[in-house]
Amino acid sequence: MFFFITFVEFFDFIVNDRYANFTKRGIDFFFSGDKRVDLKDLMNYLYESGIKTLMLEGGSTLNFSMIKEGLIDEIRICVAPFVVGGKDSHTLFDGEGFDTMDEGVRLELFDSFKLGDDLILQYKVLNK
């Protein structure tokens, strides 16, 4: 089991002895970055720990950070038969974005299938 914290949060663990209690239970800690986790370091750490596949569920800001760093190999999109959202809704990738088609990330559809009423589209990321 893994637990990720930023360096600033670490001091709470030292003061409260929670860090030692977690490590006694076999929970590994990953320390990286100053205010944010260095995602490339994290992916290397997970790979070296034997984790070869990761499902990303952190939200649109994390999605953008990961794709910007070239850390996403595959994207699965679920098209569901209903409409939600609005002008302030998050998109699949929130962040500074890519201004031109050349800067953007190219995808290749390699599979699609129905799952109940939903349609699942599987894309390979081409230019990581």
Where are these regions (language model features)?
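Enzymes that bind and transform nitrogen-containing heteroaromatic metabolites
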Residues: 1-128
